Structures are given as C-alpha cells and as structure tokens.
Amino acid sequence: MSRDWLCRRLRLSPRQSYSLVRSGYGPCVSSDAVLSLVNKSRRNIAAPFDHVPCDILTADELAQTPELAESGFVPRDFLVFTRRENPNNQPPFLHLNKQTTRFVKSLFLDWLAERAKDAERTGRRRFV
C-alpha cells in the first residue's frame, strides 16, 4: 500500500510513518507491517495510535467510540460473531482477519437498527 495513503488513513506525518513502519524506505508499505504495528499498539508493546480507522477497530475498541459509548453497550450477539472462527450467522460485511475485525461502521449501525426493529416486532430482546 502507498505510504501516502497510510499517512492519510492513520493521520500520521510522513516522518512518523518512516519511524513507525520501517519496512524499507520506499513509497510502499506492506499491509502486514501496518497490521503488526496496530496490534502491538493494542497490546501496549508500542505507543498507542492517536487514530485507528473504524474499519480495523475491534469490538471492544468500537464500544469506546462516542456513538456506541452513549448507548452503553455493544450487542452480545456481535461480540460472539467477532470471537468465533466460522460464524454461521455473521453480518455479510464482517470479515475476520487474525486479530482484526474489519467492517464498515455505517453498515454495522444499520445492522443494529434492523435487528432492533425485528426484536420490537417479535416482542423479544435480541441484545444484552
């Protein structure tokens, strides 16, 4: 991937990108190097990032985002999806890749809204 794209995505300066991702000094960076760096940041092995894009947040990190922190919970159903290797009923936009959960935030919120409507119609709670 392009180093410029990485800088825009993680909100880094070019100098920071070279000091953090040392995979060569060319214009490209491997996605494995970025994933490794983000996971080290998650485990407090490396300094935490100021900004991690929403599509590589884990479910626990997502719970800390302002939109879901206001509601006070991440649905247990969704946490189960993220912890199973081969979920049978996962949302179509969810992909598991090692320790990173990749999804589009707007699709996730639409999925939650749709599930909430189904629960209201049937009279049973799907979450918590």
Predicted feature locations:
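Short, charged amphipathic recognition helices of the HTH superfamily
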Residues: 1-4, 55-64, 75, 89-90
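A short, Lys/Arg-enriched interface patch at domain edges and termini
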Residues: 28-61, 65, 105-128
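Major-groove DNA-recognition helix of helix-turn-helix-type DNA-binding domains
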Residues: 8-36, 65-101
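General secondary-structure propensity
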Residues: 3-6, 108
